[in-house]
Amino acid sequence: MVKAFIGLIIISLISFSFQSFASNVSDKEKVFVSHVPKKQEWSFSGPFGGYDKAQLRRGLKIYKQVCSSCHGLKYVAFRDLKALGYDQEKIKAFARQYEVSDGPNREGKFFKRAGVATDTFPSPFANEEEARFIYKGAYPPDLSLMARARTRTMPLPISDILTYYNTAGPDYITALLTGYQKAPEDMKITDGYWYNPYFIAGNSLAMAPPLSDGLVSYKDGTPETVEQYARDVSAFLMWAADPHMEIRKKTGFRVILFLIIFAGLVYVLKIWIWNSLENEFEKEMKD
């Protein structure tokens, strides 16, 4: 009797709590859930995909002319651009366009100098505090690892492993750059912020829409649209975060091929050994 009474009280409390939560959600404000980015087709998708160097060079151009005013690439060195098809002279010329901090010198002071090939892409801000002051408390993140850091939430990564889906990062970046919309009437957006349903940290962000049609010129005839810009810079950021992807895929394929051949040889050797033992055993039994 006592157990039944206690159970009834617990059920009543759970029911009341659920109704109270549902009422709060429906009457006060809706819970924001970010949209899932659409899967894109990339040259580097799948186990055998590789980077499109022309696209990477276009993405670098987008980063330099648009993104670098707010975001750094502290883990990418100028000399790494050799993988994009740049020779040593072009890399040196590209690095000289940037001003980097160095020192201390003999007088113990820090100074500015032109970049060299061994330098990394500098941050546009002296420190985090300066960035937050300029952008009303928001801090533009470094983009070096962004394409690898933005993955999907559980349990989707489990299915991604089985289907070899490894482009969630560039898919997210593309969706974010092209996903700016007018906020719904029943959704409150902080002044100076922009609504983007793909932003994983909330319903709005401090970054204004950075891309527009015709913003950056391409000499190879590639369409100069927001969608193309977003895809190009997303591919570039994927390379920045995972520059050794192609080597890893080739090495992995060779290792798997070796293991398959090795397993086949071991199996054949096993059959041969056991057949030999069976024949010897049969001879001994006859003798």
Regions of interest found by a model, annotated:
Residues V2-G50, W239-A241, V266-F281:
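Post-cleavage N-terminal segment of exported redox proteins
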Residues G46, Q55, V76, A83-L84, ...:
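Acidic/histidine-rich catalytic neighborhood
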